[in-house]
């Protein structure tokens, strides 16, 4: 996404480069995180009980809350990234991706899986990461932050935002469904990443 944004900005206006970068990630990941975010919005927007929330998130059809969530997310994301120069935006996108995955990955270490294994949409139940894996993920995130500071001399404090969002999400999920699902992981990554960019914008 960062490479597409920076490369496309030399040919197209910044807002077009940002949209192409977002499209590139969607094509590369198969909209995995966005699909999870839409299901998350549908489930927690329309569900009033643990069972209902989980049932809605398991439904493959997107609802009103999912559509509204995605539209608002893409509008806000594109507007925030356009506010930076292409070089700075590319640095932030690369760092935000790595650091936000580092933070959001901790969800599986703090909460149990909310469904029974046979009910999981992808038939996969995430296991808690061993200590070496946690250390490796943390190292990747810290290296990304260090490179961001070397290249821009700014924005380190923005790293706090994904940590706060992750903590709040863990607390919210523990209260609402007593665990997490794959959709929650995807939603948390996008929300953590956006909080990083938004905080960086406030620091610019």
Q: Where are the predicted features?
A:
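Hydrophobic alpha-helical transmembrane segments
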Residues: 1-30, 44-52, 59-204
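Histidine-centered active-site/metal-ligand motif
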Residues: 33
């Amino acid at each position: 996404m960062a490479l597409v944004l920076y490369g496309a900005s030399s040919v197209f206006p910044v807002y077009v480069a940002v949209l192409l970068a977002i499209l590139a990630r969607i094509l590369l990941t198969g909209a995995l995180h966005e699909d999870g975010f839409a299901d998350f919005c549908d489930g927690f927007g329309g569900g009033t009980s643990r069972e209902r929330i989980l049932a809605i998130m398991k439904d493959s059809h997107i609802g009103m809350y999912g559509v509204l969530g995605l539209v608002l997310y893409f509008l806000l994301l594109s507007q925030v990234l356009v506010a930076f120069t292409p070089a700075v935006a590319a640095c932030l996108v690369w760092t935000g991706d790595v650091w936000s995955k580092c933070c959001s990955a901790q969800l599986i270490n703090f909460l149990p899986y909310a469904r029974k294994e046979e009910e999981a949409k992808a038939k996969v139940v995430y296991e808690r990461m061993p200590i070496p894996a946690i250390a490796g993920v943390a190292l990747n995130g810290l290296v990304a932050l260090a490179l961001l500071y070397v290249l821009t001399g700014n924005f380190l404090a923005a790293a706090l935002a994904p940590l706060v969002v992750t903590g709040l999400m863990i607390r919210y999920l523990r209260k609402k469904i007593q665990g997490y699902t794959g959709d929650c992981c995807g939603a948390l990554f996008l929300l953590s990443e956006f909080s990083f960019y938004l905080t960086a914008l406030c620091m610019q």
